[in-house]
């Protein structure tokens, strides 16, 4: 079975200049997607991420896809977070997956800062009054990667951290009947799905999927 990295690098090598993603009317090539993702991977590793779940903050935009692929290249797993949705669910996801690293655009990171600032007492089980200084100290416990700043990093060259036994992503239920529950999908699960789809559907170059 191929690894997820082998799938990604194969598509990159075969279709560098072709569109990989189309969002609204803008197209992004495999080369654009691949190169920026590798810089995200380097940023994560240089900031201490290691085979753990990383939060991607955002929506369906280019930066979010870059973040997801960068996390996979770094040998980590991702879980999506939307700060505009239920605040308590967001807190439960962060606590449930023991998130220490967050990736997003500046505005999205700031939105999450606001949510966490409101919930410092919940995280620390604090019984005392929470001051602005307490909040600032709390937020600095986490690693925040602004996707606009990753250009300063070199693209990752060593892909050996990715393993079939690693988690690929964790998706959370809505939590409508209680706390949201995380569904874990391994790299092996994801690769098996890709293998099956590849056998079932022989998709031509340029075929669009959503």
List each language-model region with its residue ranges.
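Carrier-protein-dependent adenylate-forming modules in NRPS/ANL systems
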Residues: 1-191, 201-202
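Gly/Ser/Thr-rich phosphate-binding loops and adjoining beta-strand/alpha-helix segments
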Residues: 206-210
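Conserved alpha-helix/loop element of class I SAM-dependent methyltransferases that forms part
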Residues: 194
């Amino acid at each position: 079975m191929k690894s997820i990295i082998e799938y990604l690098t194969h598509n990159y090598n075969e279709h560098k200049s072709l569109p990989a993603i189309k969002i609204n009317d803008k197209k992004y090539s495999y080369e654009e997607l691949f190169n920026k993702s590798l810089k995200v991977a380097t940023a994560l590793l240089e900031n201490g991420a290691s085979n753990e779940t990383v939060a991607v903050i955002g929506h369906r935009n280019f930066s979010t896809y870059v973040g997801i692929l960068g996390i996979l290249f770094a040998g980590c797993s991702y879980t999506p977070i939307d700060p505009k949705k239920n605040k308590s669910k967001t807190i439960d996801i962060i606590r449930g997956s023991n998130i220490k690293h967050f990736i997003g655009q500046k505005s999205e990171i700031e939105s999450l800062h606001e949510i966490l600032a409101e919930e410092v007492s919940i995280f620390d089980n604090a019984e005392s009054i929470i001051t602005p200084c307490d909040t600032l100290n709390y937020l600095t416990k986490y690693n925040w990667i602004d996707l606009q700043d990753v250009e300063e990093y070199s693209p990752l060259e060593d892909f050996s951290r990715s393993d079939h036994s690693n988690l690929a992503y964790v998706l959370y239920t809505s939590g409508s009947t209680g706390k949201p529950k995380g569904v874990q999908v391994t790299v092996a699960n994801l690769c098996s799905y890709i293998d099956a789809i590849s056998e079932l559907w022989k998709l031509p170059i340029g075929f669009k999927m959503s």
